[in-house]
From Swiss-Prot:
Keyword field: Membrane, Transmembrane, Transmembrane helix
GO CC annotations, alphabetized: outer membrane
Subcellular location(s) of the protein: Membrane
TM regions (residue ranges): 63-83, 92-112
Database matches in Pfam families: CRPA
Membrane topology (UniProt): Multi-pass membrane protein
Species for this entry: Chlamydia abortus
Main location: membrane
UniProt keyword Membrane, yes or no: yes
Protein name: Sulfur-rich protein
Amino acid sequence: MAGESTNSVGNDITSLIQPGLDQVIQDEGVQVTLINSILGWCRIHIINPVKSSKIVKSRAFQITMIVLGIILLIAGLALTFVLQGQLGNNAFLFLIPAVIGLVKLLATSVFMEKPCTPEKWRLCKRLLQQLKIF
């Protein structure tokens, strides 16, 4: 019985907060602040520890990652055009690694070095909308 009353209170609070959240999340300033918070957490807990590891700092690892990325990009593009007749509409699936790589490059070059600004966020949103991701 007590669990049901707690649930109804939680539902009441959620229904009370939801309209305000929908309105606030549309504000670009709030979006940028949220993105900066998430990127800051990722930078501190994921990126910095990985960057400081010995294997990632090694020249061999860096060269291997660059070569692997180039091979995946070229292979994805080549397979898209070569196998398009056989695969039909599914040929675009070979572009997924290329798109992921481009989004990664965009995110790291635009956001990771400095905080996100509203202008950068508008640019990223526009690019993601053109890719039909966001």
